[in-house]
């Protein structure tokens, strides 16, 4: 579960739209949103429980280190989830915060993308958008530092950093 407090009134419509889209997304590599409730400006999002924690827990805990073949499968899972955002979702979703802490692992060690709080929805005729910088230092795409429009490439860049973390696991200095 994730609690969001003090949601501003002007963001209510954006929140409701995002919840409608996320509730309609069904893919084996996305964490399933079971529902949400609200009390005034406070929100409680309920996601399916992921028993193996986050990819960060797996990568940065010596006892949980995956084998190379498992690392390849984890990278495929993440890539499939990102591809779903761009090729199958309507509207398209730019996640904006792909990082090991936002990739959750189910009981079979299948990687699932979670935490859509920073995501942006693209309109059907839209290929890019402008927004304030979002995401974790070390994982954000260079476009944000140059105030360029955001495209699906920002998630591809973040995935590249996660991919490096998968195959060269070091102490987590990026987050």
Regions of interest found by a model, annotated:
Residues 1-175:
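Conserved eukaryotic protein kinase-like
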């Amino acid at each position: 579960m994730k609690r969001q407090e003090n949601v501003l009134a002007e963001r209510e419509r954006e929140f409701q739209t995002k919840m409608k889209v996320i509730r309609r997304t069904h893919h084996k590599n996305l964490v399933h949103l079971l529902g949400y409730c609200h009390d005034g400006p406070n929100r409680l999002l309920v996601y399916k429980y992921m028993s193996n924690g986050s990819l960060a827990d797996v990568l940065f805990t010596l006892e949980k280190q995956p084998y190379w073949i498992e690392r390849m499968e984890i990278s495929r899972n993440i890539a499939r989830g990102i591809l779903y955002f761009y090729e199958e979702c309507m509207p398209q979703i730019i996640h904006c915060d792909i990082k090991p802490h936002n990739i959750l692992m189910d009981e079979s060690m299948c990687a699932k993308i979670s935490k859509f709080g920073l995501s942006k929805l693209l309109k059907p005729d839209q290929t890019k958008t402008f927004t304030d910088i979002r995401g974790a230092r070390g994982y954000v795409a260079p476009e944000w530092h140059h105030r360029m429009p955001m495209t699906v490439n920002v998630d591809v860049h973040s995935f590249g950093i996660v991919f490096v973390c998968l195959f060269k696991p070091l102490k987590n200095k990026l987050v």
